[in-house]
């Protein structure tokens, strides 16, 4: 995992946000595939304090951050950021995008999202402005409906991960 200073030398950044509640192997597969698809990018993993579209998290924010820290240790080109956590509220994606654009001035900023999020992107805060500021990287899951989106995006194909954070929480009765 990199420090903030190492990001300053990067012209391309990618943001991968989420609740990571809990972190599982599909999250890590998405990180690996993003780094493979975009070989010159630094990837910033951005755990949410609270996802604006979901119920409050099952795991507390410190636990989720520590899980990510352990899992990402030693992965080159990845930075774990606590920007959204420090806000102590649900942070719209556009706010995080603007923050990192101002902080690092990347030539290109990619936003890594799931196909399920892409279907509802129009309901996000300032969605049109968001699409002007980022290049989308969209991960599809095997067995899920094909993406119907008229805009441009980079696909991450075949995330064969039947595990989801929601399914894990449901199996625990939460």
Swiss-Prot record:
<dbReference type="Pfam" id="PF01467">
    <property type="entry name" value="CTP_transf_like"/>
</dbReference>
<keyword id="KW-0808">Transferase</keyword>
<keyword id="KW-0067">ATP-binding</keyword>
<protein>
    <recommendedName>
        <fullName>Probable nicotinate-nucleotide adenylyltransferase</fullName>
        <ecNumber>2.7.7.18</ecNumber>
    </recommendedName>
</protein>
<dbReference type="GO" id="GO:0005524">
    <property type="term" value="F:ATP binding"/>
</dbReference>
<keyword id="KW-0520">NAD</keyword>
<keyword id="KW-0548">Nucleotidyltransferase</keyword>
<keyword id="KW-0547">Nucleotide-binding</keyword>
<keyword id="KW-0662">Pyridine nucleotide biosynthesis</keyword>
<dbReference type="InterPro" id="IPR014729">
    <property type="entry name" value="Rossmann-like_a/b/a_fold"/>
</dbReference>
<comment type="similarity">
    <text>Belongs to the NadD family.</text>
</comment>
<comment type="pathway">
    <text>Cofactor biosynthesis; NAD(+) biosynthesis; deamido-NAD(+) from nicotinate D-ribonucleotide: step 1/1.</text>
</comment>
<dbReference type="InterPro" id="IPR004821">
    <property type="entry name" value="Cyt_trans-like"/>
</dbReference>
<dbReference type="GO" id="GO:0009435">
    <property type="term" value="P:NAD biosynthetic process"/>
</dbReference>
<dbReference type="InterPro" id="IPR005248">
    <property type="entry name" value="NadD/NMNAT"/>
</dbReference>
<comment type="function">
    <text>Catalyzes the reversible adenylation of nicotinate mononucleotide (NaMN) to nicotinic acid adenine dinucleotide (NaAD).</text>
</comment>
<dbReference type="GO" id="GO:0004515">
    <property type="term" value="F:nicotinate-nucleotide adenylyltransferase activity"/>
</dbReference>
